[in-house]
């Protein structure tokens, strides 16, 4: 495989016309995100972590400044979450200090996610209209809209992971640089650990895109090396914090052993029923007076949040669809055995770890020229999420 610089790879993937379309989509998405943006989040761990990195430290100063889930260890205070959002915040914190609004970073990255989603849909063969409708579905018809608008630390992790996962899928579909694809998936992993379990999707694409075993093995090796480098970086990061390569630090969160959501440990098969309920059946809270129903901080079922996802099940089941479904199946077990379902949230935010693959399945299930049924469900999805964003952020109509 010829050595390719990243700039050349991007130039080959993106024509000038495509770049302009991506810019227009990003600007339009940014304006919508900005209009509905929430106040600066109080839980802005990654701003302080970026500040720590800039000062040559892994631990944050000031005893954690009242941030949740800060881990005191050997006289220092550590952010337990993977560090990629803090890495992206470095230039902003360097310029503006710890007063920088992490929520602003969230919507800046979110508009890039919408553009990247449009490009991913084009790569799987969607026409211009269909790609735009489904990019809008992703940005504003899933729980991505709410988490983007809030931008707290638990939410911005999803934004960063979605961005890099979608970019990895784009380059995999374009048959470009498996080393870079591995690095991009590694960046997503450094924001949300479960997304690494989607790696079979990329290996299967490499297998399909090459007709003999020698290039298959070579490109798979490049991919795994790229991914492995970032896994190694995370292990070194863990060693720098806890003195252990494999300790993720979550068991060190003060009080987690006594938390009623974790009575069987951080992960347990006993937690599966609560996730199944959250994914399939969780509804809004019904009230006897205005506004008569309101979002539940426990979440909202996936098909209630995004009715258009019903097309996931329609098929046809091409090889790409099967690979995408496999990615979902690989990621899901670690999510549904976790003690919490992702609260507080609108929708089921853990689904964002595999939403790019759900969009592939949805696109394949819809007609190439969208009919009124598909458009109606997309519009309904947009309205549901508009209700969630406005109810919670603007009016605080939400409870358990």
Identify the role of each PLM range.
Residues 1-400:
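Membrane-proximal envelope and lipid/glycan-remodeling enzymes
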